[in-house]
Regions:
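Conserved, structured core segments of small domains
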Residues: 2-117
Length: 117
């Protein structure tokens, strides 16, 4: 079966309301979920969490500003690369993500376009 690649973009607010113990328990849920995806042969790259700071470069003038802003509710907090037979299957796999348990979390599921270089 030919598999396609998809990116999971994890979006949401920082889970600042969690105690250190709750944060550790939540991280363990992430590790368990990602391990299951890997054991099923669907996790191509675990990815990494992203810092909540950075710069934005915008437009023809290449204007540089601070951002994204941590105060923004819809910040990309990390990513993973998975393989699935189609978009529906990729969405199905995302349903077990622990991000849904806190902070109004979102998993954006995007197909990766193949480019011949």
């Amino acid at each position: 079966m030919v598999m396609s690649e998809f990116v999971y973009l994890y979006r949401g607010e920082a889970p600042s309301a969690l105690s250190p113990m709750e944060s550790q328990q939540h991280m363990q849920k992430w590790m368990t979920w990602l391990k299951q995806l890997g054991e099923q042969g669907h996790l191509k790259d675990v990815g990494q969490p992203l810092e909540r700071t950075g710069k934005l470069v915008k437009g023809k003038q290449k204007t540089v500003t601070d951002g994204p802003y941590a105060e923004t509710k819809d910040v990309v907090g990390g990513y993973s690369l998975i393989e699935a037979k189609d978009l529906d299957e990729a969405v199905k796999f995302s349903l077990g993500c622990p991000i849904f348990e806190i902070s109004g979390g979102i998993v954006e599921v995007r197909p990766v376009m193949k480019m011949n270089m």
